[in-house]
Amino acid sequence: MVGVIVLGTLATSAAGCVINDLWDRDIDPFVERTQARPLASRALTVQTGIGVALISLVCAAILALYLNRLSFWLCVGAVPVIICYPLAKRFFRVPQLVLSIAWGFAVLISWSAAVGELEVATWLLWGAVVLWTMGFDTVYAMSDREDDLRLGVNSSAIFFGDKAANAVGLFFVGTVGLLAAMGINLHLHMGVWMAISAAAIVWFLQYSQLRKVDIPKPVYGKIFSQNVWVGFVILAGMIVGEIF
């Protein structure tokens, strides 16, 4: 089951990334951070991109057939969200929320596949993932703010304006609160509390950086990348907390 979930996640993530680049291929060349992407730079053709996306989706669909009924239908529900996310920036003022919900499906699908149902702790973890994603992807959007304003596309960084750093801080505080609530609900032990504490410290330091004036653009990317490792720490803590 773990193998199915991991491979399915990789296939879905690959499809989502390619679909995003397909939708944005006429925008990405004019954004400093994304202008070197294969479709934006014309290193890959649109036909190749569509082919990769379809193959990835087919692989994900085949793997979904090995899941229970609830998990399968959650996979089906995730597809339109993943496909529509890149369009959200054109019509919705906070497109990062759509991305956050898309990421949240990973929690719902994995949990239901393992347990067979969605529990209180499931929704607490789902909420934590949604808020966490809102936080780190708002940071990512802060590096593109000038380009997005010029191109007329939306982002949470633009929506929150000069309060974006405070919004990120609140998202991270909410994430810590929901993770703690999940830990209490599941009676997890020392491992998860150590992981949550470590994550909280990192997020506080990141928030402190974002509060500074005239932040170099590479800092936003660095903070975004740090959250990958924060995720691994939290995952490890949850595993240790469940086992011991």
Model-derived features with residue positions:
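Multi-pass membrane catalytic core of lipid/isoprenoid biosynthesis enzymes
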Residues: V2-T9, R25-C75, R150-M190, I196
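Interhelical loop and helix-boundary elements at the membrane-water interface
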Residues: L22, D26-V52, I83-A102, E146-L170, ...
